[in-house]
Amino acid sequence: MWLEESQMKSKGTRHPQLIPCVFAVVSISFLSACFISTCLVTHHYFLRWTRGSVVKLSDYHTRVTCIREEPQPGATGGTWTCCPVSWRAFQSNCYFPLNDNQTWHESERNCSGMSSHLVTINTEAEQNFVTQLLDKRFSYFLGLADENVEGQWQWVDKTPFNPHTVFWEKGESNDFMEEDCVVLVHVHEKWVWNDFPCHFEVRRICKLPGITFNWKPSK
């Protein structure tokens, strides 16, 4: 009986000794995968790196996902961009399409409640990125309107409007039926801008600045 108990105790002590080794191997493998490939990192707090200090950016967003963007040709490093979970990162900004319908003003209030604004689009690359997130069957409000002065378009986040970087559908904008707001709509196999009544209800896209910090590849 004593021999059997001793053997059982001896056998029982072998496996616990392996646990730290297994854990170490798994941890090293995971960390290696993170640094070798583009790594998604989820954090519990939405933080911004500013002049060497980490400060809390927003109480609304308590978890973020960070993605490493590859360096541009000729660059010596790249950028990590962190966005709230479920938001999509692109060139230091975060984007979030919503699938319920609201008026333009309701949409902007909804985005503001998430520490963001209705989306601004300032480049063709940004237009192409945003539209790949959308459902072609629906229209989506942009953060662009000319409610104050007809024909003087303004972005809701005060970004300067560039009349040379626009994606209007042919014949737009035409202010038909007091169309003072703008939607993204898929027409003739491409996404374009249409002026649109602000009180109509459609889907929307919110945008906020991401948390960014630079990285350099190891030599």
Swiss-Prot record:
GO terms for cellular component: plasma membrane. Pfam families: Lectin_C. InterPro entries: C-type_lectin-like, C-type_lectin-like/link_sf, C-type_lectin/snaclec_domain, CD209-like_CTLD, CTDL_fold. Disulfide bonds join C83-C94, C111-C206, C181-C198. Its main location: membrane. The chain crosses the membrane at residues 21-43. Residues 44-219 are extracellular. One of its GO terms (biological process) is positive regulation of canonical NF-kappaB signal transduction. Coiled coil: none annotated. Constitutively expressed in myeloid cells including dendritic cells (at protein level). Expressed in the macrophage populations of bone marrow, spleen, lung and lymph nodes. Gene3D superfamilies: Mannose-Binding Protein A, subunit A. Keywords: Adaptive immunity, Calcium, Cell membrane, Disulfide bond, Glycoprotein, Immunity, Innate immunity, Lectin, Membrane, Metal-binding, Receptor, Signal-anchor, Transmembrane, Transmembrane helix. SUPFAM superfamilies: C-type lectin-like. Residues 90-207 form the C-type lectin domain. It is a single-pass type II membrane protein. It is found in: Cell membrane. Ca(2+) binds at E172, N194, D195. Disruption phenotype: Knockout mice are born at the expected Mendelian rate. When compared to wild-type littermates, deficient mice show resistance to lethal systemic inflammation caused by exposure to mycobacterial cord factor/trehalose 6,6'-dimycolate (TDM). Mice are also susceptibility to C.albicans infections. Heterodimer with CLEC4E; disulfide-linked. CLEC4E acts as a bridge for interaction between CLEC4D and FCER1G to form a functional complex. Heterodimer with CLEC6A; this heterodimer forms a pattern recognition receptor (PRR) against fungal infection. This is C-type lectin domain family 4 member D. It comes from Mus musculus (Mouse). The gene is Clec4d.
